[in-house]
Regions:
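Positively charged, small/polar-rich N-terminal and surface patches that mediate targeting and assembly
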Residues: 2-126
Length: 126
């Protein structure tokens, strides 16, 4: 189903954006596993945050202080609905340690993808 947008037709969501906040040291393994699962392309951002893990205490020049935001990595991938389950299962399996602080996965509908260089849209732009 398509609806008219500004210069492009906007399709109803058939693609999903997966954002996963994971531990730094799990990044390479997750990247390799997603590549094997036929997920192509990834954006990686250094982020800081906290959840149930909260912060931790550190010593600096003899003084103790609390670090509220912990360093993590956020990976973003866009997949078709047919690859969604495999991609999410892969991230869960590879990034999980079983400890607090393993991270979160967020899944959102993606209305459109446009390749800037060619103007291709949808799956062909991925």
């Amino acid at each position: 189903v398509e609806r008219e947008g500004s210069a492009h037709r906007i399709r109803e969501p058939v693609m999903k954006k997966i954002e996963a906040v994971i531990r730094h040291y799990k990044l390479e393994d997750v990247k390799n596993a997603l590549t094997q699962a036929k997920v192509e392309g990834m954006t990686v951002t250094e982020v800081r945050g906290f959840g149930r893990q909260r912060g931790h205490k550190e010593m600096y020049r003899g003084a103790e202080y609390t670090v509220d935001f912990l360093p993590k990595v956020k990976i973003e991938v866009v997949v078709t609905e047919s690859l969604l389950k495999d991609a999410v299962d892969t991230i869960m399996r590879v990034a999980r340690t079983g400890q607090i602080g393993d991270g979160k996965i967020f899944i959102t509908d993606l209305a459109e993808v446009i390749r800037i260089r060619t103007g291709e849209t949808g799956e062909s732009a991925m």
